[in-house]
Curated annotation (Swiss-Prot):
Residues 14-98 form the YcgL domain. SUPFAM superfamilies: YcgL-like. Disulfide bonds: none annotated. It comes from Salmonella arizonae (strain ATCC BAA-731 / CDC346-86 / RSK2980). It comes from the Bacteria. The gene is ycgL. This is Protein YcgL.
């Protein structure tokens, strides 16, 4: 009996490794390979501080990420080898409150 070898088609799954900044709160660096910062600019690494491993995340089959746009992350990883996630802008609660109070006052004056 003759054996037939069927070549396997290997699809390259896309993973990313996420590191937390030791210098900046809520700042994360996504790279393609664990401990490989070779494509990350030196100035960015200096400002980021010592990377602290947060998680390894498969990107294939995923529909969204919590605090980043999935397609932007994938594109940045392919094109530049990293993605930097910055913290969301701080909420200006006083401005929101004054805006709400102003709206309520204008409705009361009618």
């Amino acid at each position: 009996m003759r054996q037939v070898t069927i070549p396997l088609i290997q699809s390259k799954s896309m993973f990313c490794v996420i590191y937390r900044s030791s210098k900046r709160d809520q700042t994360y660096l996504y790279v393609e390979k664990k401990d490989d910062f070779s494509r990350v600019p030196e100035a960015l690494m200096k400002g980021f501080g010592q990377p602290q491993l947060a998680m390894i995340l498969p990107l294939d089959g995923r529909k969204k990420l919590v605090n980043a746009e999935l397609e932007k992350v994938k594109q940045a990883l392919r094109e530049q080898g990293y993605y930097l996630q910055l913290p969301p802008p701080p909420e200006d609660l006083l401005k929101q409150h004054l805006s709400t109070v102003g709206q309520n006052t204008s409705h009361a004056d009618r």
